[in-house]
Amino acid sequence: MKQMSYVTRWLYSTSHKDIGMTYLGFGMLSAMMGTGMSVMMRMELSNGNSQFFHGNNQAFNVMMSGHALLMMFFFIMPVWMGAFGNFFLPMLMGAADMAFARLNNISFWCLPPALVCMVCSVLMEQGAGTGFTTYPPLSSMSAHSGPSVDLAMFAMHLTSMSSLLGAMNFMVTVLNMRTMGLHMVNMPLFAWAMFLTAMLLLLSLPVLTAAVTLLLMDRNFNTGFYEVGAGGDPVTYEHLFWFFGHPEVYILMMPGFGVMSHMVSTYSKKPMFGEMGMLYAMGSIGFLGFLVWSHHMFVVGLDIDSRAYFTSATMVIAVPTGIKIFSWLATIYGGELRLGVPMLFALGFLFLFTMGGLTGVMTSNASMDVAFHDTYYVVGHFHYVLSMGALFSLMGAYYYWGPAMFGLKYNRMLGEMHFWLLFMSVNVMFLPMHFLGLNGMPRRMPQYPDAFMGWNYMSSMGSAMSVMSVLVGLKSVLVQLENGENEELEMQVTPDFTESNLNREIRDSDLDLILTRPAEYHTYSELPVLTSNSHA
């Protein structure tokens, strides 16, 4: 292969692997920025008096808004969809590349300008202290007159464009680029997860785009969509935003569900228990996610019938989620369990995601949510689901597939240290938030009565511990990049039930397990043929 220049390879790239790597680097940069913002907030909250922002409560809310947007739109979504999805979906499909290689590249290059807009919105004038929901009238010109909210809106537009282009690419790839013999029902669960995530993005993002476009018009062109004085209604924005916002939670979680199935199956030396059940559960979660958005809005004055419906529909989501949890446990049960680093993160995910789900059942009740709404109970709940569910499955995916991406093994001791430090720190950080919420401490408040100080101090200690775990994780990555060729992993990754690719025919659809590490720049010179219905 002719040697490409650095600029040609990384700037004009059409290789799904190179684009995946750029997404991974971008996601890590955004994660560092978002973590820094969260640490500033926890430093402020470690004491009831003003600690860090010197009474500038707007700055606290700006940090909070920036933290949320960076972590969701610039870290978890790009790493899941862009890095792991781009890198491994064609390999799992037996495809040469993604369906639209140049579209793949432009969907990445929408993100750096979006990040610039996001950072500028934090730094310019008074910043966008609206929360990531940007509800009017707080986000209207009367409350935030500078350009900050507009810049945050532009950032959301650009990330939406990136995600929509990526989602179309993923859907076309899955529908049209499968290798011979690989039917939809036989696809690995990670490929199904990416397909369902792409469908959720395609259906929900246009609604967000419409909502923030109307907000931009209210701010700049004197329209009155959300202005009560002009005959508008701010609750319209809430309905539009949460119609996107709830599927967004499953967009962040769904790839983790897929990768969890791979990790649990591999490290239990068993095929996944109830594979079709897992598939239908993922589809059900995605479908139901569009029917429950108003559970975020129980206190805006919904009528009693609406509250009864949204409570019931939200509780129904617990059923397919429970099916997934018990199927993972059934796969582990009776298997030859090997506690490699990816499996530690998978077990951590199972425990923490279940905890987050249990607190979610409580907040789904319209009567109880009147007490929980806008307290730290909700903050604790969604961080258990996202900071622990999405993050632990993502870290597990890195340790599981990192050797395949780089061809370099990680240091197992550092990986285990990373897991235990992160596991302890996130529990110390987020468990006290539930107690604060039950006692009535409101969200988004930098100063509070001394009665709340004990649990807040404990939570801030957890935040400091999490910084240590991030440093250990970075050290683990650096050691892998510097010395990965010399590391030894005692735990063989390929499970016993994967068969060889004799005569280019293989009997299992987890194609990534039989490829070289790192995978070749062009993975398949000749496309593989699958001969079995092992996943049907």
From Swiss-Prot:
Biological processes, Gene Ontology terms: electron transport coupled proton transport; mitochondrial electron transport, cytochrome c to oxygen
Positions with a binding annotation for Mg(2+): H373, D374
InterPro entries, A to Z: Cyt_c_oxase-like_su1_dom (IPR023616), Cyt_c_oxase-like_su1_sf (IPR036927), Cyt_C_Oxase_1 (IPR000883), Cyt_c_Oxase_su1_BS (IPR023615), Cyt_c_oxase_su1_dom (IPR033944)
Binding-site positions, Fe(II)-heme a: H67, H383
Pathway where it operates: Energy metabolism; oxidative phosphorylation
Topology relative to the membrane: Multi-pass membrane protein
Positions with a binding annotation for Cu cation: H246, H295, H296
Residues that, per the record, bind Ca(2+): E44, P446
Primary localization: mitochondrion
CDD domains reported in the protein's UniProt record: Cyt_c_Oxidase_I (cd01663)
Single GO MF descriptor: cytochrome-c oxidase activity
Cellular compartments annotated: Mitochondrion inner membrane
Top-level taxon of the source organism: Eukaryota
Subunit structure: Component of the cytochrome c oxidase (complex IV, CIV), a multisubunit enzyme composed of a catalytic core of 3 subunits and several supernumerary subunits. The complex exists as a monomer or a dimer and forms supercomplexes (SCs) in the inner mitochondrial membrane with ubiquinol-cytochrome c oxidoreductase (cytochrome b-c1 complex, complex III, CIII).
Protein name: Cytochrome c oxidase subunit 1
Annotated organism of origin: Debaryomyces hansenii (strain ATCC 36239 / CBS 767 / BCRC 21394 / JCM 1990 / NBRC 0083 / IGC 2968)
Lineage: Eukaryota, Fungi, Dikarya, Ascomycota, Saccharomycotina
